[in-house]
């Protein structure tokens, strides 16, 4: 097989998509134009040797996890039969029993063993284990040993962590946040709905703010802030149409905007001004990523068999979107590029201003 010819053919549809994006951008009333340029497309089966010092970006596509480099080398692709978790630092594949789990560094060397029963979850350089029964979780250290744990009487329905804290939402409508050492920092129940389940939660990078989608039948979106030993609600609004599944909530890096997936829309709240905006997006939002300069927001959503990437400028203004069909997908940002995974292929698109 002529791989170079195949690679060129794969870039053609992506180039067409971004030519359309260029036309859309060029009619925007902006002082600059943002250009998207296709760089490469690789199949995850094309494994190449790579220096350990090179940046490795994690991916998950269907039943495959692994790492690739910004210059287009697929470093590893591991097929897992049941469940897996991956971050820039570690990866692990595990079965249904979940009695103990070996986990590995990105280069494939053993990092440690998690002896806690349950399903491990890696979030950047943080390790958690969701324990059997669904009401308890464990925070582990970098070797997989238990640092602290917490058990509630009601099942965990939403979870989030950041550098400075962890937040969990529960089926009884309670939201609890924890300091990095496991001490409870905030605990409150938003209420206001006929069914008070927490369907989505996020904690800000500094650990001071928590946002959640709360309840059904008079569903609300709420942002709370630490105020002494209490939690102060700094924003709330009722949602006209309730969502009935777990949903994504995410702060931007500076915690001045928070995003959430409502029923066929993306909700955006400016936490400094206590203002909100809704952008129509059908289906389920699976990822929200930010460019390194924080000027662009990329939103990946899926409606039936169609994926859509929606691009926002200045945190709230829709600029463009494009769609494609696929069985699985992901997006990642790094420096001045966005990486898009689709089925068994990964593509790099560079971003520039001219």
Can you say where each PLM-predicted feature lies in the sequence?
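A short beta-strand motif characteristic of beta-propeller blades
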Residues: 33-44, 71-80, 105-115, 143-151, ...
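N-terminal start-of-chain detector that recognizes signal peptides
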Residues: 39, 100-101, 138-140, 149, ...
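Glycine- and small hydrophobic-enriched segments that form the cores of compact globular domains
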Residues: 130, 139-213
């Amino acid at each position: 097989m002529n791989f170079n010819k195949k690679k060129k053919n794969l870039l053609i549809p992506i180039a067409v998509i971004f030519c359309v994006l260029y036309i859309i951008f060029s009619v925007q009333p902006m002082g600059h134009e943002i250009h998207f340029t296709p760089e490469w497309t690789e199949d995850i089966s094309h494994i190449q040797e790579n220096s350990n010092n090179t940046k490795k970006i994690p991916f998950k596509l269907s039943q495959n996890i692994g790492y690739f480099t910004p210059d287009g080398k697929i470093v590893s692709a591991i097929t897992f039969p049941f469940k897996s978790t991956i971050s820039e630092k570690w990866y692990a594949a595990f079965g249904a029993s979940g009695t103990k789990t070996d986990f590995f560094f990105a280069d494939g060397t053993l990092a440690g063993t998690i002896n806690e029963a349950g399903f491990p979850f890696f979030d950047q350089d943080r390790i958690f284990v969701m324990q059997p029964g669904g009401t308890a979780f464990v925070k582990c250290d970098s070797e997989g040993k238990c640092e602290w744990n917490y058990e509630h009487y009601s099942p965990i329905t939403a979870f989030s962590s950041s550098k400075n804290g962890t937040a969990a939402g529960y089926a009884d409508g309670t939201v609890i946040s924890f300091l990095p050492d496991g001490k409870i920092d905030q605990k409150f129940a938003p209420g206001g709905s006929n069914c008070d389940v927490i369907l989505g939660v996020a904690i800000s990078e500094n650990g001071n703010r928590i946002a959640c989608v709360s309840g059904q039948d008079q569903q609300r979106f709420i942002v709370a802030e630490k105020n002494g030993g209490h939690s102060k609600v700094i924003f709330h609004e009722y949602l006209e149409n309730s969502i009935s599944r777990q949903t994504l909530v995410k702060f931007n890096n500076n915690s001045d905007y928070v995003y959430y997936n409502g029923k066929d829309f993306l909700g955006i709240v400016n936490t400094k001004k206590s203002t909100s905006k809704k952008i129509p997006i059908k289906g389920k939002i699976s990822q929200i990523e930010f460019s390194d300069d924080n000027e662009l927001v990329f939103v990946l959503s899926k409606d039936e068999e169609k994926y859509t990437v929606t691009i926002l400028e200045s945190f709230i203004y829709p600029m463009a979107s494009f769609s494609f069909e696929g069985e699985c997908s992901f997006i990642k940002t790094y420096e001045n590029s966005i990486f898009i995974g689709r089925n068994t292929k990964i593509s790099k698109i560079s971003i520039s201003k001219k």
